[in-house]
Amino acid sequence: MLSFPIETGSISKNKFTAKLSTSMACVLLLLTTGCSQGETKSAQSVEAINTKSASTVAASNSVSTLRIGYVGNSEPTGPLGWAKKKGILDRELQQAGFKNITFARFPNGPDLNEALVAGQLDVGSLGDTPAIVLRARGQETRLLRITQFNTTAWLVAKKNGPRSLAELKGQKIATQKGSYMHRYLLGLLAEAKIAKDVKVVHLMTTEAKAALERGDVAAYATSSDLGPFLKSQGFPVIDSSANHKGLSGTSLVVATESFLAKQPDFPQKFNAILTEAAKDLKANSEEYYQYHAQITKYPIDIIKVSLPLKQISEEPLPAEGVKLLEGTKKFLVSQGLAKSDFKLTDWAAKE
């Protein structure tokens, strides 16, 4: 397990118990550990969804079984989720020799990382920050694809609270640790030169609205979907990553090297599936938006704002996405948040 004896903090119904600063040493631990709010901490307690039969989970060590982990809701979204929903994934992978496909849902990237390290997953769909941090620790993963890039993060304030970054001095700001929103917040605070003047605490996105309503936090750095939704509910937006070069996120698909050693042609086959799914969801955008809204429980007009389909990549490594990913990696390394540097070209799987 990737865990350290550190107080990461959590939020009770009435107040924060966390006393975490934004010092780089603490943030490094935040980025490499899982959450501690009674959420899922390892693959042993994640929700496994088998496209064939629950009994096949026991056969997860078989080469004929593909174990996919993802961060998010009851079902994956984006090209992976669409490929699953439309039957593209099942059809093509069965032809490739996979008899069983299992899906495990995780609340955040660090928890998914733990499952990859433990050998409980073959493939992971997650954000750039946890994926980079894991690779920088020397874990043997390979980058298969950038599925989405320029994903916006938002900094939303409580009502009747601060309206500018300067007004956040001396305040508590929350975000979901180890996420692309976390990296955005760290970069934003560094740009504004107020990193030492605020307290950053961990809070899952599912608890953000209630915490803002109670006034437990002055602001919350949140995801592309939740940001516009909170704005529609009257919460002021202080900032978004769209206002800053290099602070938006990318979504990645990685695989373990041990799995790829057994399935060397998997990157090409899997990327072909996701490319087909990406093109199909764009060609059927209204149907996809309805699916995405159903899964995330946000109104469809919010989804259309939060997810311009131009962010969905039709190729494995789009140039714009690679540039953004390189910038994120450099930031994490320069701040000591990623343990070591590496070349993206070395990380990328060869097709």
Region locations from a protein language model:
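Pocket-lining segment of extracytoplasmic ligand-binding domains
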Residues: 129-130, 197-201, 205-293
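Short helices/loops that flank or line small-molecule/ion binding pockets
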Residues: 109-121, 136-139, 167-169, 188-191, ...
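A local structural motif
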Residues: 63-66, 92-105, 120-122, 190-202, ...
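C-terminal motif of bacterial Sec signal peptides marking the signal peptidase cleavage site
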Residues: 31-34
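Secondary-structure end/capping motifs
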Residues: 74, 261-337
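Flexible hinge/capping segments at coil-to-helix
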Residues: 157-173, 259-268
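Extracytoplasmic "Venus flytrap"
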Residues: 53, 57-85
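Bacterial signal peptide processing site
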Residues: 36-39
